[in-house]
Amino acid sequence: MAEITQIQVESHVFPPEVKPPGSDKTFFLGGAGVRGLEIQGKFIKFTAIAVYIEDDAVSSLAVKWKGKTADELTDSVDFFKDIVTGPFEKFTQVTMILPLTGQQYSEKVVENCVAHWKSVGTYTDAESEATQKFLQVFKNVSNPPGASILFTQSPLGSLTISFSKDGSLPENGKEVIVNKQLSEAVLQSIIGKHGVSPEAKKSLSARLSDLINQHENPKKE
């Protein structure tokens, strides 16, 4: 694989490789960017977000996406869906630029997830139970600037949630929630069709386009 570089988002530097909690594998940095909102004519940056994926992702994505440019990938809803739902592990690090309580963060995530699931008719008791667990994990968590919320997503359907105050990664997660829809929804909310970080999407497209197009012999599914 081509050399993977670090990415700096505001004052936070995301390293090229990490070993996330809840996995025994090393992941490479797929892309990173800010999440912000336009408030009274000014762009306010709330979090810096990095998306890491395991090495197997490149050969998996190359089957369908080899030969595409970074711009073509950025404009493709299906490309990001294939990252979210692909048969490989993903790790997302959400680092605070401005302080945000765990309750504020988790309630917004759950609100968006439930609205989407209801709109497509996939909201069941299992999802209701999973979102309640999700809210509980974040209940008394404070996230000052520099603190991170960490998500390790298994293709088997588990979501490992962890926290870090100083940028270091703990060995073990705080909670594991087994629900495939919730597991995928967290990353979907960041890089999906209405993802909250267009900058992270562009970064992913540019870096993965290079890796995919350099990849030899894409495997057939």
From Swiss-Prot:
Taxonomy, superkingdom: Eukaryota
Q: Where is this site: Important for catalytic activity?
A: Y105
**Which reaction is recorded as catalysed by this protein?**
a chalcone = a flavanone
The EC designation for this entry is 5.5.1.6
Q: Name one GO molecular function term.
A: chalcone isomerase activity
> What UniProt keywords are attached to this protein's entry?
Flavonoid biosynthesis, Isomerase
Which cysteines are disulphide-bonded?
Answer: none
- Tagged with keyword Repeat: no
Pfam families, per the entry:
Chalcone (PF02431)
Q: In which pathway does it act?
A: Secondary metabolite biosynthesis; flavonoid biosynthesis
User: Where do the annotations place substrate binding?
Assistant: T47, N112, S189
Question: Does the keyword field hold Isomerase?
Answer: yes
Q: What does this protein do?
A: Catalyzes the intramolecular cyclization of bicyclic chalcones into tricyclic (S)-flavanones. Responsible for the isomerization of 4,2',4',6'-tetrahydroxychalcone (also termed chalcone) into naringenin.
Family assignment from sequence similarity: Belongs to the chalcone isomerase family.
Please share what else the UniProt entry notes about this protein: Part of the biosynthetic pathway for all classes of flavonoids, a large class of secondary plant metabolites, many of which are brightly colored.
Q: What is this protein called?
A: Chalcone--flavanone isomerase
UniProt source species: Dianthus caryophyllus
Print the organism lineage. Eukaryota, Viridiplantae, Streptophyta, Embryophyta, Tracheophyta
Coding gene?
CHI
